[in-house]
Amino acid sequence: MKVLVLNCGSSSVKYQVFDMKNESVLAKGLAERIGLEGSRIVYQRGSEAKKVFEIPLPTHKKAIEEIFKLLVDKNNGVLQSLNEIDAVGHRVVHGGDKFVESVLVNDEVYSIFKGILDLAPLHNPYNLQGVDACSELMPGVPQVLVFDTSFHQTMPEEAYIYALPYEWYEKYKIRRYGFHGTSHYYVSRRVAELIGRPVEELKIISCHLGNGASITAIKNGKSIDTSMGYTPLEGLVMGTRCGDIDPAIPILLMEKENLTPKQMDEILNKKSGILGISGVSSDFRDVGEAAEKGNKRAELALKVFAYRVKKYIGAYYAILGGLDVLVFTAGVGERGPLERSLICSGLEHLGIKLDPEKNKVKGEELRISAPDSKVEVWVIPTNEELMIARETVRVVGEKIIKKVI
C-alpha cells in the first residue's frame, strides 16, 4: 500500500510518499512560497540529493498538481502513475471536540470539518484546500484527516475546562485542546517499544521542543494533560510565542500602546518568546551562540525557557503520580544538549539524572539518563509523517467514517 501524506500550510505544502510494506519513504519534499514570487518545489527521491524546481505556484491546488507531476516524472518520479497511490493522509491542526480520532473523509465529515475552520484560521482552511485539490486531481482515492488535537481528547474535564463563565464553553467551545498530538503519540509508543514495556503500563512526560513547543503528561498510553490550550499560544516559552502570561497584560498594553487586537495577537505569537527576550533570534542555535559569547539577554532567554519546561515537568510528575520516562523530541529536544541539560538540572530529587556524555547526542534515538537515574530519559526523533501514514492505513482498513462527540 502506498500512502501520500500532505501537510498544507498558509504558503507551503509538505509531502511524503510511503511504501507501507516496509514503511520506506519513496519521495518527499516541500512546495513553498505558494501565491508569492519565487515559488518552488524541493523534491527528494529516496536518499538521493534534493532537487529544486522553480515553478509558479499561484494556488495550493497548482502546487499539489506540480508535486504529482514530479512523482510520476520519467526522470525523477517514483510512481508509474497516480493510480499507485492508495490513500492520502492529511495533517490537520485542529479538530476541536468534534473529532476524537482520525477519520475517513465523506460528505458528512467534510461538512463538519468545514464548520470548524475558525478554530485554527491560519491552518485549517489550507488543510481543507489540500483535501479539495486531491478530490479533484485523484477522484475516488480515500482521504484521511489526522488531527493534532485528537490524542488530547482523553484529557479529563478538570484538565481542559478554563475558569471562565461556563456558558462560554457551552456556546463557543472555549477549552483546552492541545496540539502536537501526533508527535506526542508517536514518541510515547516508540519509547515504550524501545524499553520493551507496554505503553499502557507507563507514566510518560513527552517534551516536544521546537520553535513551537508543548509538553504532555501520558498515563496508560493516554494524554491526561498538555501545555498548549485553546490555541498553540499557551504553555511553554517558544521561539516567537509568549506561552503562559498574566491574561491582564495584553489588555493593559493594548491601552498603553494603542494596539488593536490583531496587532496584539501578532506580538504575542510572532514577536515574543525567545526572540522577544533575547532580541537576537527565534532560532535556539543563534541564541545559544550569543549566550556563549556573553550576551546576557540570550542567556536569560534560555534560562526562562528551561525554567518553564522544568515547572511543567514537576506539575505533570504530580498529576501522573510519579514518572517512568521523560522524552525529548522535535528540533530543540532532539538536537539541544544545552537545553536538555538546563531543563534536567535540579530534577535529581524526582529521579531524573542525565549522563553528560550521552546527552551530547543530536538527532538519534538514545537513552541519555545516567545508569542510576530512576527515571529513564530518552531522545526520540519525532516522525509525524510516518504516524499519519500509519493512521491512514488503519482508518482506511477499518473504514472509520467518523467519530463525533
Swiss-Prot record:
CC cofactor: Mg(2+); Mn(2+)
Keyword ATP-binding on entry: yes
Pathway, per record: Metabolic intermediate biosynthesis; acetyl-CoA biosynthesis; acetyl-CoA from acetate: step 1/2
Annotated EC: 2.7.2.1
Cofactor detail note: Mg(2+). Can also accept Mn(2+).
InterPro entries (alphabetical): Ac/propionate_kinase (IPR004372), Aliphatic_acid_kin_short-chain (IPR000890), Aliphatic_acid_kinase_CS (IPR023865), ATPase_NBD (IPR043129)
Listed GO MF terms: acetate kinase activity; ATP binding; magnesium ion binding
Keyword flag Coiled coil: no
Similarity comment: Belongs to the acetokinase family.
Name of this protein: Acetate kinase
Lineage of origin: Bacteria, Pseudomonadati, Dictyoglomota, Dictyoglomia, Dictyoglomales
